[in-house]
Each structure stands twice: as structure tokens, then as C-alpha cells.
Curated annotation (Swiss-Prot):
Residue ranges the record marks as coiled coil: none
HAMAP family (UniProt xref): LeuA_type1
UniProt xrefs under NCBIfam families: leuA_bact, PRK00915.1-3
Protein's recorded name: 2-isopropylmalate synthase B
Sequence positions that bind a divalent metal cation: D80, H277, N313
Classification lineage: Eukaryota, Viridiplantae, Streptophyta, Embryophyta, Tracheophyta
One record GO biological process: L-leucine biosynthetic process
């Protein structure tokens, strides 16, 4: 059997050793080694650093993975992630995120919950048709998955949406913990087992060959009951068994043991893929996910930036980079097919679209993740980067400097704008490209240098806006310490008519928001307001995020509890003027809320949401 070993030049000890464990894989190129030399600045010797490129993704079969070390990444950003308060996405935004997930190379995209609303149904269908039939490298095509409760209506809706993809999947679930069965479902164990078995069989009977089943709240379920119900759904045709720690209750050792015991005690488990879905209520979602993988799970459910219900989900970037960084050494050789150089761009896209800011000290993608301020650390970094960096920032798509030498400025042309945005992960053309370019030119007239972060902020503000009901034309404010601030706002409605209003307030932003309210005449409550400087300097672009809640209507029904939830809507704005940035964000949130109201009125159907 072939093997590859790289030794340390001084100690002679192995740095990396690779020996294929599966004889069927000996003819495939899984590693492409690229030795490079990293030198100490004040030393006379060099240390060879061996890096490897992305491994080949094994051919997809629903219930089997040819390479036992390969781990599938299931991205549920568009389903569970969107359930974060204020993270409501438009159909176009969901499509853009799905495209970016495909660039990442995720194996499965859970595109939504089609039965929750007609809007979600159409969004999942659009993603299935476009992203699920895309042309990618090495014959890769992502699986497109739709969530469904264990009932025929939900399953029919899910199949209606995902069947257009080359690789469609239905993900159905029912609760299995005593507290859920007794108080929420009001069903006996036998009834729950029969419902799960019959609905998995029904999903297979309508033509779906890839069916995932989740026993909701598995982390608090009786293990013996889990083995039984999982065995029954395997017999009914399930291809993936997802084990959700729905309330983030377990600790890593406990969750790893649960996965191991399921593999050891569930009849027929050798014919399916075991999956994990870990919530972050105790801050253990990444650790639990890795523990599950070490115990035998070969599908990991994650979200970009870890967004999701309550405290969020296991973070895609953390899980993937942990496997990349420690997979060979301590995680049994586990690896994924993720192109990690798209991680940072994916994070920024989801941050901009969802309006959920990434905390500066967030692992992997936070603003401080690769920043060194301590004098001792800085000294070490100057001598050798490996002293305080276990991950190269370039591995996630973060370039320390503009290596191309191309600087964006007011003299740059539109022909440079398109490839630059493509480099940043955005495919835009036509009117969207023109609008972005002229917005960029406007900023470039006032700002000497336009950074990548500036472009991303302008992209989010100009392109990732909901279908406009109202459009900001002008805003003029007067403020100071001598009296109330005043604001005059001009908005354009969908028919092109101008509306002007004036108001006073305790500050320029408050006055401007009150002027907008006088025009729109829709009562809302401002729940959150935040502003960040995109870059450094007095000429930095200000990025604003607001979260609002409508006073009338705008509710959704929780699919599991039946509870009425007051839906919130976020809006983002970007401009060098903080008042204009603030008003853009507020108008964007209002547009999203009013578009949602029109859609619900058109379909005359309440929306549902689901948690697993």
C-alpha cells in the first residue's frame, strides 16, 4: 500500500503521514501535496511546510459513502439559520446564499421548509431548479433538501419543491422525548413510531429516493426508544438518520456516546448515514458535533456563522476548519469536501443579508480572529507566523494585503467592477452591476481608497435589498445642542410618486425615522439599532442594522407548538453619512415587512416555522 511521509528537517520526526485505509481508493488522487518554504526572519534555516489541496469528493449515494473518512456537510443556513430573529430573507437573497453554499462545496443544502408558506415553497423550488442543476467542478452537484413534518401535506409540499433538483431529498421529523410526546404531541410511543414509519414510507412511495429522518429532541430521549424508532424508519426506507440535540442539552462525551450507542444498537444502521444537528444553548454545539463525528456520524448539520434558533447552531466554519486543522492528527483522518477559501466570503454574505453581525472575537471569521495586539505575540509573529497562528488566514480566503496591486478608485471602470465582485464571491450583471458601479463611483468621489469591505457593504446595501415598496430619494437634517433636531425626507413609492414629510426628534436619526413613519403610515416598533464603521478612518462607510416589529399582524405560527410568534424584520444600510445609512436601513426593514404582508395576504395563509 502506498504511503507518503514528510519529515522534520532537524528532528527527523514525521510531520505528516498518509496511508490510504480503503484499498478501493488507492487509484484516486486524494492528496495533492505542495511543499512550500517558510523562513524565520532572523534565522539561517528553513522549515518546509506541507500543505494539501482539497480532496476529491466521493461519488454521492444517499445511504453510503465510499470513503469511510469522508464527512458530509449539511448546510441548514436557509432553514434553521433563517429562524434567527430578524434574519428573514427574500427569495433572491436565499438564492444568492444557496449559490455561495455551492461554491463552498457543501454536500447538502437544506433550502427551507416548503409547507411553511408559499414564499418558502417557491424559494426552495427556485434553488432546486438552479443550484440543484448547476454545472460545477468534478461533477459535483449539491443535494437540495426540504424540511417536512411527519404528515402527508408537508411531505407533498417538500417533494413539490425539491423534485426539480438532480439530487432531491426530503427531511422529515417528529419528536421522541417524553416531554415533547406528552405535552406537545399528546401521542403515545407506539403512535409516534407508527407516524414516523408510515411517513418515511410515504416519502419513498412518491418518488423520493433520499429521505432523512430526525427524532426531535433526541438528546433528551430514552435511548432504547431511539434505537427502536430509528430501526423502524430504516426498514421504511430512510437513508439518513439525523440525531438532533434540539435544545443544546448534552455535553461532548455524552453526545459522542449517544451516537456510538445508536450505531451499536440500531437494527440496520450499517445501511444508513448517521447525522448530527447540535444547537448551541450551552455553547457546546461545535464540540458536540465533532464528538459525534468521532463516534461515527458522517453527516454534520451546520449553519454559516452559526446562526439559528435561540443561541444558534454548530458553526460551519468552526466545524470544517477543526476537521481541516486536526483531522489527520486526532480526529481519525476525517475530512470534508469544503473549499475553505470561500469561508470568509460566505460569512460576510450571510452577515450582510441576515443583518446578524459577527462578533469580533468569533472563531475563524471574526474581525479579531487573526489580529495580534500583545507585544509578545507580535514579536513571535514577526519571527514566525506559526508561533501564534494555527490556521493560515489565506486558507479561509482572507488576504493580508492587496497582492494583485489593483486599487479601486474614482477612475476605475465598470469592466473592473464585475471581475472584482466575482473575486469577492458575487455574480452580478446588468442593472444590478450598473447600480452598484454608480454607487461605488459616488463613494469614490469622497473617499481616496475603496477596500473590499467597502465593496461588500455597498453590495449588501444596493443589491441585497428587498423588493422596494418605498425608495429613499433625499434626506435633510438640522441638529445641534440648541434645540430639537429636524428632518425632511423624500420617499418614492412603487408607482414613482414622490412623498415628502418633515418631523422633529431627539436626534437627527429619530427625526428622520419619524418623518418616514408619517409617509409610510404603518405602525412599527424599533427593537434594535446598531452601527459599525466598515473600515478605519474618518471617511469610513457606516453600516447600520435595524430590527423592527409590526404592531398589526406580521405573525407566524410555530409548526411544533402552535404558538403565535411576532415576526421581526431586519434592514441594513450603508453610506458615508450616518443619517443616510440609518434611514436606508429603516426603509429596507419596512420594505421587507410590507412585502411579507402583501405576500401573506395574497396567499391568504398563515406562515409556519419549525425547529429540530
Amino acid at each position: 500500500m502506498a504511503s507518503i511521509t514528510a519529515n522534520h528537517p532537524i528532528s527527523g520526526k514525521p510531520l505528516i503521514s498518509f496511508r490510504p485505509k480503503n484499498p478501493l481508493l488507492q487509484t484516486q488522487t486524494l492528496f495533492n501535496f505542495k511543499p512550500s518554504i517558510s523562513k524565520h526572519s532572523n534565522s539561517s534555516f528553513s522549515i518546509p511546510v506541507v500543505r494539501c489541496s482539497i480532496r476529491r469528493i466521493p461519488e454521492y449515494t444517499p445511504s453510503h459513502i465510499p470513503d469511510p473518512n469522508y464527512v458530509r456537510i449539511f448546510d441548514t443556513t436557509l432553514r434553521d439559520g433563517e429562524q434567527s430573529p430578524g434574519a428573514t430573507m427574500t427569495t433572491k437573497e436565499k438564492l444568492d446564499v444557496a449559490r455561495q453554499s455551492a461554491k463552498l462545496g457543501v454536500d447538502i443544502i437544506e433550502a427551507g421548509f416548503p409547507a411553511s408558506s408559499e414564499a418558502d415553497l417557491e424559494a426552495v423550488k427556485l434553488i432546486a431548479k438552479e443550484v440543484g442543476n448547476g454545472v460545477y467542478e468534478e461533477e459535483y452537484v449539491p443535494v437540495i433538501c426540504g424540511l417536512a413534518r411527519c404528515n402527508k401535506k408537508d411531505i407533498d409540499k417538500a417533494w413539490e419543491a425539491v423534485k426539480y433538483a438532480k439530487k432531491p431529498r426530503i427531511h422529515t421529523f417528529i419528536a421522541t422525548s417524553e416531554v415533547h410526546m406528552n405535552y406537545k404531541l399528546k401521542m403515545s410511543r407506539d403512535q409516534v413510531v407508527e407516524k414516523a414509519r408510515s411517513m418515511v414510507a410515504y416519502a419513498r412511495s412518491i418518488g423520493c429516493e433520499d429521505v432523512e429522518f430526525s427524532p426531535e429532541d433526541a438528546g433528551r430521549s430514552d435511548p432504547e426508544f431511539l434505537y427502536h424508532i430509528l430501526g423502524e424508519v430504516i426498514k421504511a426506507g430512510a437513508t439518513t438518520l439525523n440525531i438532533p440535540d434540539t435544545v443544546g442539552y448534552t455535553v461532548p462525551e455524552e453526545f459522542g456516546q449517544l451516537i456510538a450507542k445508536i450505531k451499536a444498537n440500531t437494527p440496520g444502521v450499517e445501511d444508513v448515514i448517521i447525522s448530527t444537528h447540535c444547537q448551541n444553548d450551552l455553547g457546546l454545539s461545535t464540540a458536540n458535533t465533532l464528538a459525534g463525528a468521532c463516534a461515527g456520524a458522517r453527516q454534520l448539520e451546520v449553519t454559516i456563522n452559526g446562526i439559528g434558533e435561540r443561541a444558534g447552531n454548530a458553526s460551519l466554519e468552526e466545524v470544517v476548519m477543526a476537521l481541516k486543522c486536526r483531522g489527520e492528527q486526532v480526529l481519525g483522518g476525517l475530512y470534508t469536501g469544503i473549499n475553505t477559501q470561500h469561508i470568509l466570503m460566505s460569512s460576510k454574505m450571510v452577515e450582510g443579508i441576515s443583518g446578524l453581525h459577527v462578533q469580533p472575537h468569533k472563531a475563524i471569521v471574526g474581525a479579531n480572529a487573526f489580529v495580534h495586539e500583545s507585544g509578545i505575540h507580535q514579536d513571535g509573529m514577526l519571527k514566525h507566523k506559526d508561533t501564534y497562528e494555527i490556521i493560515s488566514p489565506e486558507d479561509i480566503g482572507l488576504n493580508r494585503a492587496n497582492e494583485s496591486g489593483i486599487v479601486f478608485g474614482k477612475l476605475s471602470g465598470v469592466m473592473l467592477c464585475k471581475p472584482k465582485m466575482l473575486e469577492l464571491g458575487y455574480e452580478i450583471e446588468g442593472k444590478e452591476l450598473d447600480d452598484l458601479f454608480w454607487r461605488f463611483k459616488s463613494v469614490a468621489e469622497k473617499k481616496k481608497k475603496i477596500t473590499d469591505d467597502d465593496l461588500v457593504a455597498l453590495m449588501s446595501d444596493e443589491v441585497f435589498q428587498p423588493q422596494f415598496v418605498w425608495q429613499l430619494q433625499n434626506v435633510q437634517v438640522t441638529c445641534g445642542s440648541l434645540g430639537l433636531s429636524t428632518a425632511t425626507v423624500k420617499l418614492i413609492d412603487a408607482d414613482g410618486r414622490e412623498h415628502i414629510s418633515c418631523s422633529v426628534g431627539t436626534g437627527p436619526v429619530d427625526a428622520a425615522y419619524k418623518a418616514v413613519d408619517l409617509i409610510v403610515k404603518v405602525p412599527v416598533t424599533l427593537l434594535e439599532y446598531s452601527m459599525n464603521a466598515v473600515t478605519q478612518g474618518i471617511d469610513a462607510i457606516a453600516s447600520t442594522r435595524v430590527l423592527i416589529r409590526g404592531e398589526n399582524g406580521h405573525t407566524s405560527t410555530h409548526a411544533l407548538t402552535g404558538e403565535t410568534v411576532h415576526r421581526t424584520f431586519s434592514g441594513t444600510g450603508a453610506d458615508m453619512d450616518i443619517v443616510i445609512s440609518s434611514v436606508r436601513a429603516y426603509v429596507g426593514a419596512l420594505n421587507k415587512m410590507m412585502s411579507f404582508r402583501k405576500l401573506m395576504a395574497k396567499n391568504n395563509k398563515p406562515e409556519s416555522s419549525a425547529v429540530i
